Design a protein with these regions (language model features):
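Extended glycan-interaction surfaces of carbohydrate-active proteins
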Residues: 17-100, 132-176
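Inter-helical turn/loop segments and adjacent helix faces that build the functional surface
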Residues: 1-13, 115
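Solenoid-repeat scaffolds in large eukaryotic assemblies
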Residues: 9-12, 65-66, 121
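Short, hydrophobic/aromatic alpha-helical segments in well-folded domains
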Residues: 1-4, 22, 107-111
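TerminUS-proximal long segments
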Residues: 116, 122-127, 148, 152-156
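Inward-facing hydrophobic residues that define packing positions of alpha-helical scaffold repeats
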Residues: 13, 20, 124-125
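Alpha-helical support elements that line or immediately flank enzyme active sites
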Residues: 51-61, 105-118, 125-128
Length: 176
């Protein structure tokens, strides 16, 4: 935006460069995934989460994550779970231990589309839309059976629905 407005973006460009270099330090060879890293302990969380798939949304087009994505999506029906279903820590109802969040799914889907992974992006979109259409604007959903959980009227879930519904209507009318 700054460049469009003909503003000085040197400082922000420097921040972006540092972040782009730093993101690769979040790759955890042990689990073959991007992972959370605890700066205090100096250790990885050793867990694949929905945040692991935010690499594409962040402009890091890493094909190594595709096999993890495919493996996990083959185990669920209602969007990207917030935690790996194969993990002993997985709990499909517990906050950030398994439920699917529409807002995270939207960002992952956008990232996949930006990376040219259109079929995978559509899978995330269709599964998320299925959860919302069947169960309303819940805060999050069980990724296996779609049961709504948390708050029942979340605006970010409604915003995801409206954003993706707009795209669906545009596609049906031959418009983007």
């Amino acid at each position: 935006i700054g460049m469009v407005l003909d503003q000085d973006v040197n400082e922000i460009s420097g921040w972006i460069s540092i972040q782009e270099q730093g993101v690769h330090r979040l790759w955890n060879d042990k689990i073959s995934s991007y992972d959370s890293f605890d700066l205090n302990s100096g250790k990885f969380a050793d867990s694949i989460s929905s945040a692991s798939f935010m690499c594409w949304y962040g402009g890091v087009y890493d094909t190594r994550m595709l096999s993890q994505f495919d493996r996990i999506m083959n185990k669920v029906n209602y969007g990207v779970p917030s935690h790996d279903p194969d993990s002993v820590k997985f709990d499909r109802k517990r906050y950030w231990r398994g439920p699917s969040w529409a807002i995270m799914n939207m960002m992952i889907g956008i990232g996949l589309a930006d990376a040219g992974e259109f079929e995978r992006a559509e899978l995330v979109k269709s599964q998320t839309n299925l959860a919302i259409s069947q169960n309303g604007f819940a805060e999050y959903f069980d990724p296996i059976d779609g049961t709504p959980a948390g708050g029942t009227t979340f605006t970010w879930t409604a915003a995801v629905w409206l954003g993706w519904a707009k795209n669906l209507v545009g596609e049906q009318n031959g418009r983007d």
